[in-house]
Amino acid sequence: MWPQPRLPPHPAMSEKTQQGKLAAAKKKLKAYWQRKSPGIPAGANRKKKVNGSSPDTATSGGYHSPGDSATGVYGEGRASSTTLQDLESQYQELAVALDSSSAIISQLTENINSLVRTSKEEKKHEIHLVQKLGRSLFKLKNQTAEPLAPEPPAGPSKVEQLQDETNHLRKELESVGRQLQAEVENNQMLSLLNRRQEERLREQEERLHEQEERLHEQEERLCEQEERLREQEERLCEQEERLREQEERLCEQEERLREQEERLCEQEERLREQEERLCEQEERLREQEERLCEQEERLREQEERLCEQEERLREQEERLCEQEERLCEQEERLCEQEERLCEQEERLCEQEKLPGQERLLEEVEKLLEQERRQEEQERLLERERLLDEVEELLEQERLRQQDERLWQQETLRELERLRELERLRELERMLELGWEALYEQRAEPRSGFEELNNENKSTLQLEQQVKELEKSGGAEEPRGSESAAAARPVPGAPVPQGAWMCGQAGWTPQEHPGLSGEAVGTGEAAGGAEEAACHSFRAAENRELNITII
């Protein structure tokens, strides 16, 4: 019987061996990480069972590792845990790849060794057979060459026996030759297979060399990362001590935060009451708008009356000018009369002898004085009347200007109040959206303990700003009633045509340049309040996240 070549191992058996190797590699990895990780406290597993939290989400309930204990409070802990997980996954992948490659290499080497052994044994066996056949042929040749002694013809002669043996040996040689040819062909096929397998093995060896180089590089990186991890572990140990101190502080802060939540609930109730008040104010504003429309019609009528009064004043001015001209003429006449009287006096002085003439002169002088006094009194009365009329007109203009200013101020106040109402509504909407986002994000811890102090300060600032807004809202409610009463214009007071348009269609600084500074100032103040409210809202959101972490 010829020796049969060894077959490669069954694939199912190779898979089982690979699985066993993988399990062994995993066990080695676990043992390696247990050696590298620092001492875990004794009560860690108990805390895990009591809290019922998974090792990925639990942060303060159980101490899993120095990387896991700091997650949720510091960003460095989370980064270290992620790097550890990445390194573990990479290391596991590399270990699996090494195990699989080593298993494949071992299988291929075993196959090659078995094939080499079979080929060597077959060659030895063939050489041994050839040697035997050569010896047998040599013996036969020697026997045929030697002269045979004649023997008695008792039976078949030795020559015949030798011929029979030679024929039998030839047949055996032919069969052996055929077998040798078949074996040679098999050996050629096996040699081809061996060459192909050797080429594949060379390619695999090259790949393995590349993988080994990569593994060496990765091992160097892992060593560096291990050093970094050791440093991080030392830092984490220090952080654990700090965290224990911070937990006590956090308990105190939780109580404070609960009190702040109660305050916020009270503030929400107050905001709801303010919303109701704002709705009532909106209804009042609508009524005021209707009244203002009626007042517009009255103002138009007053404008028409004022135009008529202006025309009358112009006519009175013309009359006054005519009266002044007449008075000037009368003064000239009086001057002429005085000159004449002076001449008459001179003449009378010459005629002193005549007492009757003196009496006449005295009477004439008295009459002239009476006429002068009457004329002066008439002039004074007319001037007083004109002055009274002018003063009345000036007073009406002043009142009209004052009414315009008051009306403009009231319109600006109403606009500011409406803007504040809109801002308060926007703030309430933002608060509602913020509460919803906070309830959704309670399971995701984001910030650490160092940010808690800043966030608590921001929450205190938010409370102060809300109190200031409440105070300003309470102080502006009585102003609303006063502005509604003052918005009613005085009957008979003139109002310009573009005054109501600025309040109804939107005030523009081009129509009223004197009031643009006030409006801009109020807008800037409102913008600052909005920014402060947004900042405080963000602080409240961060505070809620810290509450969920605790």
From Swiss-Prot:
Location of the region described as Disordered in the Swiss-Prot/TrEMBL record: 1-77, 467-529
Keyword Coiled coil set for record: yes
Biased composition (Pro residues): 1-11
Keyword line: Coiled coil
Compositionally biased residues, Polar residues: 51-62
Presence of the UniProt keyword Coiled coil in the record: yes
Annotated Basic and acidic residues bias: 467-480
One Pfam assignment: GOLGA2L5
Coiled-coil annotated residue ranges, if any: 157-405
Extent of Low complexity compositional bias: 484-499, 517-529
InterPro entries tied to this protein: GOLGA6L (IPR026737), GOLGA_cons_dom (IPR043976)
Family: Belongs to the GOLGA6 family.
Protein name: Putative golgin subfamily A member 6-like protein 19
Taxonomic source organism: Homo sapiens (Human)
Protein's gene: GOLGA6L19
